[in-house]
Amino acid sequence: MGHKTHPQGFRLVTTQKHLSEWYGNKLLYPSLIEEDFVIRQKIDISFSEFLSISKVEINRINQNVENKEYVNVTIHALYPRAKEMYRKVAKYFTNNIENSNPKTLSLLNNNKGTLKRFTSLLLKRNIRSLTRALQVKYGKNYSISINFIKNPFEDASLIGKYIGEQLEKRVPFRRAVKQAIKKVQLTDLKGIKIQVSGRLNGIEMARSEWKRDGRVPLHTLRANIDYSSQRAETIYGTIGIKVWLFAGET
């Protein structure tokens, strides 16, 4: 049996870096790992209605002037499109605001500038509430920022989520994979490989299929490889999606 190596962990010395960058006392190490897990979990809960999150980077500075640990949290997420913003804001209105006025929603739909401002206000509100909750729970200083990704087809995680959404809508997996590859071809990336595993198209026997376009040199340490593993929950069961992107050599 062949043994697979994680493409990003294999290149931590050369082209990749850890998503959590900090050093800690060995007695505090488990609690810090748990804190990182809770931060990422709360971010998924707080921003899932508005953003498609790619990754969350956590950087700790040991001490500041007030002898408190300072934690920088950077959220890498897709910049929301107008239609998606309206749909997600409307969902937020109906779920969180009582007696939401349909005229307000139609005004947001017709005025993109107002919609963007309202979305940014909601994001800032969520950032403030999340920062306050983390400060109360852990007693540390937190700085949360959002780094928007303009093109979702330059990020492996967002491509995997896109394919997963298509599969959950019962789109044939070959069509979803071909659409993703065609959109990646419009970018400056050198190559892409996509693997889909599970009960594809509802067939009882599970299998794996993959498709590649361009070069994806997984054995070259200089290669800048972006990797993501996602899952889609369909009516036939869980389907696994793996995406490799090759952006060039350093």
Write out the residue ranges for each language-model feature.
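Ribosome-associated RNA-binding proteins
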Residues: 1-250
